[in-house]
Amino acid sequence: MRQLYLDCDGVLADFDKGATAILGLAPRAFEERHGLGRFWQKLAQAPDFYFDLPLMPDAMLLFEAVRHLNPIILTGLPRGNWAADQKVRWAAEHFPGTRIITTMARDKRNHAKEGDVLVDDQERHRPLWEEVGGVFVHHRNAATSLDELAQYFPISAG
């Protein structure tokens, strides 16, 4: 039986909104102006950055439609050891009882079996996931992801 995995940042958690509040600029603009090192340094210094992220506007719509499939949250970590606990607590707060796996983004594929489905907003993760026989759904919003997921799973109308 195929497993459904949901990425966290950009699918369930609004990383960009949370990062903008800390950085004072949109994440890409801050990174271009100050560099990737300073970007992550500022976020790492923010108390409970990941735990405090708001939900994406349509996160609950997506999750409720797939809850019966027992999805697993599969989320990438930045370098360092500061983010995993925050992400685990965030998932427990917003999606109690849902399993979460924290890993380096490049290692997400190590959790896939052939046919498993990953919903992720970062298209750059597609090749590694598909290389192991997984199905990649590029998340733009809940409606389009649910339409695509309906090819692989029975989707709840809510």
Locate each region found by the language model.
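Substrate-recognition "cap/lid" segment bordering the active-site pocket of phosphatases
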Residues: 74-117, 123-127
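Short, structured coil segments at secondary-structure junctions
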Residues: 67, 96, 131-133
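Short, acidic loop-to-helix structural element flanking the phosphoryl-transfer center
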Residues: 31, 45-73, 80-85
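Hydrophobic anchor at the start of a short beta-strand
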Residues: 70-72, 98, 136
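Acidic, Mg2+-coordinating phosphoryl-transfer loop and its flanking beta/alpha structural elements
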Residues: 117-150
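Short amphipathic alpha-helix with an adjacent loop that forms part of the alpha/beta core around
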Residues: 109-112, 148-157
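Active-site neighborhood of HAD-like aspartate-dependent phosphohydrolases
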Residues: 1-44
